[in-house]
Every structure is written in C-alpha cells, then in structure tokens.
Amino acid sequence: MDLRKKIRIVENFPIEGISFKDVTPILKDPKAMKHTTKEIAKYLEDKNVDVVVGPEARGFLFGVPVAHELDIGFVPVRKPGKLPYKTFSVDYALEYGSDSLEIHSDGIEKGQNVAIVDDLLATGGTVLGVSKLVEKLGGHVSALNFVIELTELKGRDKLKGYDIQSLVKYDL
C-alpha cells in the first residue's frame, strides 16, 4: 500500500508557509491503519521489544495499535501535569525555546527494550527527549519508528546512534 496517497497535505497550516502532513486519513481508513501498524510491528519483530512508548498526542494513535500487534504494553509520555502518578521529566530543545515531557516513574523497568513510536520525525527534538526519559529510567531504546519523516529538517542527524524507521519520507 502506498501510504503517501493516504496522507493529506494541508498548505499554510498551522501557519503561513508550512505544508502540514495530516495523518488523520490513515486513522479513518482501517486498511491503511492496519498496514501502518503491521509495517512498524514487522520492523520491530527481531528487536526483542518489551514495551512501546509514544509521545502525546499522535504517538498514542500509532503506538497503542503497534503495542497490541506485538502483544506488549504501551507507556504514554505527556506534557507536564497530565500524568496522575509520580513522574520523571526531561526538558528538551525546540527550534525556538524548550519544552518538557513526563513519564510515569514506573513506566519503564530497568533493562527493558523500548520502541518509541510517533507520527512524525521533523527536527528530532521531541523523540530525543522521549529517548532520554526512557534511558533515565534504565531502558534501552531499541528503535524509533515514524509514519512520516521530513528529511530536510535533518532529525536523523540529532538521533545518531538510534535505529530509525520511517514509512514515508518527504523533502520539504
């Protein structure tokens, strides 16, 4: 299946000059969603992954089905103040400024192999922050999996040393 045909391009969203890659048509199409889930799960089959981690919000949409396909658990990573139990946090750099992410303190067990699943790899800042959280808890990041990669933003450069999968690549 050509997933590129299922990704809607919305020009000038959320601001002028941005060409937004909208994954909601994949979510709406059960065959496209199943294909996406199976492609990521197939990539992870030989990586001995114990748990899938996904950043809010679209990481939840793809991470949970992948975890179910692999018959393993899912751990959410959220913005500060959104998780009800004790958390660990990390600050990470954005293109202009910084942000924070949190994970439950018991979300990852020491030595667990973790796949981080998200919809989009752009600059790599968010997933690098998520990776640091996983590693802070003693987990090993086995793979970073994305539906879309915006290659010109060079997120891969920031993620050297990690095993990266992206299903669809766009040059800006």
Curated annotation (Swiss-Prot):
Keywords, ordered alphabetically: Cytoplasm, Glycosyltransferase, Purine salvage, Transferase
Alphabetized SUPFAM superfamilies for the sequence: PRTase-like
GO CC annotation terms, alphabetical: cytoplasm
The record, for Pfam families, names: Pribosyltran
- Which Gene Ontology BP terms does the record give? adenine salvage; AMP salvage; purine ribonucleoside salvage
Can you name one GO molecular function term for this protein?
adenine phosphoribosyltransferase activity
Subcellular compartments: Cytoplasm
Q: Which reaction does it catalyse?
A: AMP + diphosphate = 5-phospho-alpha-D-ribose 1-diphosphate + adenine
Superkingdom of this entry's organism?
A: Archaea
Pathway(s) of this molecule? Purine metabolism; AMP biosynthesis via salvage pathway; AMP from adenine: step 1/1
InterPro entries for this protein? Ade_phspho_trans, PRibTrfase_dom, PRTase-like, UPRTase/APRTase
Q: What is its EC number?
A: 2.4.2.7
Please give the subunit comment from the record: Homodimer.
Role noted for this protein: Catalyzes a salvage reaction resulting in the formation of AMP, that is energically less costly than de novo synthesis.
Q: Which family does it belong to?
A: Belongs to the purine/pyrimidine phosphoribosyltransferase family.
Q: What is this protein called?
A: Adenine phosphoribosyltransferase
What is the gene called?
apt2
